[in-house]
Regions:
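ATP/NTP-dependent adenylation/nucleotidyl-transfer catalytic domains that generate, transfer
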Residues: 1-148
């Protein structure tokens, strides 16, 4: 995992507190090496079978690895978010949002072990439709659990 929890939380809080219009801090875990940053753009996307199948495939990788590693029962909730931010309309970027919470009113992003993250990233990077993968490192508050 890229860095220590304390430093990531400090940076995330600094960003979201300094710019009130920013409510998320995400870390890029992977970008397809064949795609340049300037090639990634918002794409028009619909909630159709093909897109949902892609989301389910990515989510299944994450959930399988969480189960295998024993982390599934340690996190309160995990969301896999499909972003229409890609090089073309048939591709997507995804955000991982595992959180830990005891009272639902507050939550911290789950700091998954490096080996678990590496397994997840490696498998997702093999999928031909994935242009980028991010990790939501925002606590609640200021962020909510879900993405709207």
């Amino acid at each position: 995992f890229p860095g220590k929890r304390e430093k990531i939380e400090e940076c995330s809080s600094t960003i979201t507190n300094a710019a009130k219009f920013i409510n998320r801090t995400c870390i890029k875990l992977y970008q397809n090496p064949e795609i340049k940053n300037e090639d990634l753009k918002l794409q028009k996307g619909y909630c159709d079978k093909a897109r949902l199948d892609q989301l389910r495939e990515v989510d299944n990788i994450v959930l399988t690895e969480l189960h295998k590693s024993g982390w599934y029962d340690k996190i309160f909730q995990h969301l896999t978010i499909d972003l229409p931010y890609a090089s073309c309309k048939d591709h997507a970027s995804f955000v991982l949002r595992p959180v830990i919470s005891e009272d639902v009113m507050t939550a911290r992003f789950a700091m998954l072990p490096k080996e678990v993250m590496e397994n997840i990233v490696h498998q997702i990077a093999e999928l031909p439709f994935v242009d980028a993968l991010y990790f939501d490192a925002t606590n609640k508050p200021p962020a909510t659990f879900g993405w709207e």
